[in-house]
Amino acid sequence: MSYSQLVWFKKDLRIKDHSPLYQATKNGKCLCLFVYEDEIINSDDFDTRHFNFLNQSLIDLRKKLRQLGSNLIIRRGECVEVLRKLHNEHPFETIWAHQETGNWISYQRDLRVLSWAKETGIQYKEFYQNGVIRKLNTRDGWSRIWNQRMNEKIIPTSSSIHSPNNIDYGEILSPSNFDLNTTSNSKGLLGGETHAKQCLETFLSDRGKNYQKEMSSPVTAFDSCSRMSSYLTFGNISIKEVYQTSKERADQIRLNKSKSNPEDKGWLKSLSSFQSRLRWHCHFIQKLEDEPEIEHQNINKAYDGLREESFNSEYYEAWLKGQTGYPIIDACMRALKDGGWINFRMRAMLVSFTSYHLWLHWKKPAIELARLFTDYEPGIHYSQIQMQAGVTGINTVRIYSPIKQVTDQDPQGIFIKSYLPELNSVPDHHLAEPHKMTQLEQSMYGCVIGKNYPHPIVNHAEAYRSARDRIHSIKKMKSTKEESKKVFLKHGSRKSNRRPVRS
């Protein structure tokens, strides 16, 4: 009996810099498999926008595999059952796959597949594809290993792939096959390796020149940010390739640097900032890799019980619908529903607002934001959610002012008015707090508060003071500081300018 190799595609939907694919093709005929998993697609953190981006990625991957003489086998079901059936039909001796740090469901899935492979006598070979280190003993030296990995050679693409004959390759499924909302039509980027490379090229050749200066404002971030996050989430391109390509661009600028071109200095600063964020990308995923429970539990147990005692559903629904009475909050929520992306500072502000102003526990907003973010990456998501909610004990407590963010990031209301047309006639100086307009002004500008646009659901100053006092009362406790030391040892950055937690 002839045995094949099996490449199990998960969130690594590309052919370049793909160690499992490259190694498998060197060992004989190769089966390339992707599984639509009902338990993942039906989970609370999955949305049609993810499905659409996934399908676009699969279409592109299948096309590229066909060009190499192979094809992508597509199946639906529970992974172990799919693998068992496929193995009976077309025996394979080795499963080749990338390590994945996903949500709890995918974590348990991986354990089941590994167990089945051992029981069946099938070799299971996993490869890392980023800077996340499995079975990490200490954070000391983590950055050094990350740098080593990012500077390794790009894995070449096989010139051809030999696959067994007489296989039912299956079809790409639609949202309706899973009872997903088929009317959800995100205006975000298109998925796939081809689009990933195009997006990176436009960022490094033009869009990224003011990245460092323009990443914080939603007015400029949509163009000036790299927009590579979704492509990294679905593995349409490796983080190593992104990092090395950005370094090559920086080297090119240094080589051709001209004193008469002030843009060169800005470019180098922007590329340096971008590269540091690629490292942070893996830094945060490492937290979930080391402690999968943070998807459901506070990183710092000293904060258990902080917000669990109540959950104001009216506040939550207003935030969800973009009807809080704070324009920058509402515009961001509507932008997310429209396109599935918003820049980091605005994400942090949204979580800060729910956690402090509305005093909501982070779990339910985290699930909703996961559904809204096309680039939802569980490791980054839950680490950042807890950081912005103030329950890590090792990060600075930041309570973003939704008023100050307007004056700092969108003083002319360019972003706000594009998503809140009811405020189109409101003058710039009233945009941060339209409820402070007089009745006459409200009539003049066609924006009656309580009719055309809601009253603020909470008082900013009062909510700020209350949240600050409550969070700091816990943070300064001796027991909290002791717990925070443990959190820092397990998860804290070892950057030289980072202060350790002190008693």
Outline where the language-model segments fall.
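Active-site "lid/cap" and pocket-lining segments within catalytic core domains
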Residues: 1-275, 285, 392-503
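Active-site-proximal binding-pocket segments
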Residues: 227-429
